[in-house]
Amino acid sequence: MSLSNKLSIRDLNVKDKRVLIRVDFNVPLDGTTITNNQRIVAALPTIKYALEQKAKTVVLMSHLGRPDGKKVDKYSLAPVAKEVERLLGKKVTFLEDCVGEGVENYVKNACDGEVILLENLRFHAEEEGSSKGPDGKKVKADLEKVKEFRRSLTALGDVYINDAFGTAHRAHSSMVGVELPQKAAGFLVKKELEYFAKALESPERPFLAILGGAKVSDKIQLIDNLIAKVDSLIICGGMAFTFKKTLENVKIGNSLFDADGAKTVGEVMEKAKKHDVEVVLPVDYITADKFAKDAQVGYATDQEGIPDGWMGLDCGEKSVELYKQTIAKAKTILWNGPAGVFEFDNFAKGTKATLDCAVEAAQSGKIVIIGGGDTATVAAKYGVEDKLSHVSTGGGASLELLEGKDLPGVSALSSK
């Protein structure tokens, strides 16, 4: 799966065509109030472009929450339609279903330039391919009904645009089942693919990956895929303790230790040696007597280790200095996973200092990519998203891409 050769919306002529766009409007709601509209704002450039290029109609489809294949009022996209209308400054027609004769007829006879938002795709089991039965167990959707669902979605457009990167790792009907001749990436997906291609297909070297997070076993595929591509690797966050204890027998007290992950540490280091990859680990720690915001704060280095009853929740200044030096040498930096428990202020300094270095690197012209999930939350928390080259919008999708997996939603797009 090449990331750099997919059709994008700019490659298409959408004039007088019905443009069917899979967006990600999975926004947090408090009742019917949207508490964060960022995902809607992110989709606006693609929607506006289709309208500027004189598309006949723009049909938007999305999921919201996990209604498990049935209609659940609190997951209706009706409040989202009002917000899209407000942001676009243009009327948005909300339809109470996403497939079926009524929807098909409405779209067929829509006014020129009309924007239509369909109801939640996941109200139908055919979107995800399964639903939950009364006993909470998965029930597979009927294959014929899935085919009909996909046919009905396909009938709503002349061209298909995917701008929902966060769902690209799911082989859902709206991601892979629309059978139109031209299927292209919207601006959001295009940017994701461009930046991940810069890292994974043709990085400017030296290439550094910063990998944090809790468990080695959760990140092992990621480490495995990247170790053959990078020049240096910083391993930080909770999973560093498994490396420190296994490799150097550092006393880690009650810090996180991943027994399963420990079995793979030797293998990782062997691969690093084989590919001539410099591996950087923390050397000092900010410690806590419990996993809590109000924990007592301590400090430990590799020499004395972390005492029993205490746990490392962040890295210390010496570690940050090592990270800084490694970041300074790199030209492409990919970061996935925080350096400490940034949710607690007393244990956020290591992550914040690493972020400051990453911002400085990006501002000096280096490519800095934040790989979604918690690290994207960190960038948002400190308001620096626009100071980095790219902050991915896909948690699971970016992780799978970095693990070397094909994303069904990307594979389904037409190639140039």
Swiss-Prot record:
PROSITE patterns: PGLYCERATE_KINASE (PS00111). CDD domains: Phosphoglycerate_kinase. Pathway: Carbohydrate degradation; glycolysis; pyruvate from D-glyceraldehyde 3-phosphate: step 2/5. GO terms for cellular component: cytosol; mitochondrion. Its cofactor is Mg(2+). One of its GO terms (biological process) is gluconeogenesis. ADP binds at G213, G237, F342. ATP binds at A214, K219, G238, G312, E343, D374, T375. GO terms for molecular function: ADP binding; ATP binding; metal ion binding; phosphoglycerate kinase activity. Mg(2+) binds at A214, D218, D374. AMP binds at A214, K215, K219, G238, G312, E343. Its main location: cytoplasm. It holds the Pfam family PGK. (2R)-3-phosphoglycerate binds at V23, D24, F25, N26, Q38, R39, S62, H63, G65, R66, L121, R122, H169, R170. It catalyses: (2R)-3-phosphoglycerate + ATP = (2R)-3-phospho-glyceroyl phosphate + ADP. It is found in: Cytoplasm; Mitochondrion. Its EC number is 2.7.2.3. Keywords: ATP-binding, Cytoplasm, Glycolysis, Kinase, Magnesium, Metal-binding, Mitochondrion, Nucleotide-binding, Transferase. Catalyzes one of the two ATP producing reactions in the glycolytic pathway via the reversible conversion of 1,3-diphosphoglycerate to 3-phosphoglycerate. Both L- and D- forms of purine and pyrimidine nucleotides can be used as substrates, but the activity is much lower on pyrimidines. Negatively regulates the biosynthesis of acetyl-CoA from pyruvate in the mitochondrion. Monomer. Belongs to the phosphoglycerate kinase family. HAMAP family: Phosphoglyc_kinase. This is Phosphoglycerate kinase. It comes from Funneliformis mosseae. The lineage of its organism: Eukaryota, Fungi, Fungi incertae sedis, Mucoromycota, Glomeromycotina. The gene is PGK.
